[in-house]
Amino acid sequence: IGLTWRGQPLLGALAVPALDRPYWAAPGLGAWCNGAPIQVSGCTSLGESLLVTGFAYDRHTRLDNNYAEFAYFTHRTRGVRRGGAAAVDLAFVAQGLLDGYWERGLSPWDLAAGMALVEQAGGVVSAYDGSPADLASGKLIACTPGLQQPLVDGLANCRPLTGASFGAPELDPPTP
């Protein structure tokens, strides 16, 4: 559950019952899990980072699906995971279990609670270009402060600006 004020996340609450992890965050109170304060990891190196992302449900009609980005970061980090739920991925970044997150094609209700968690845990949440995140845009970076610029740069440079190519022929979507 996320509460926003003027388009920005303010409060966040999230439960991951399978792991017995309730999370919550509020301005001035920080971010918490199971009654203990949490914070983002101290990772500052893309090469040492462990990232997480997601993919749109319909890869054949979403040509901006995330394959090029996934390939780019997979070869430049310790690894990239695919968690499945944006809010949980963001909670894991807030807790320092993962170092960074990016994804596109999301709705405000996917992001609001997790954004509040990351920010209150000392992380950075932004648009792909590094500007302030916009819930309505559906795309987001969330990470440690030291990883923001490498993620912004990677997202800007991982695919050709003009073509339909995803950076590697084997990653291009099938033609109908």
Over which residues does each language-model region extend?
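Hydrophobic/proline-rich hinge and linker segments of small-molecule sensing/allosteric domains
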Residues: 30-34, 51-54
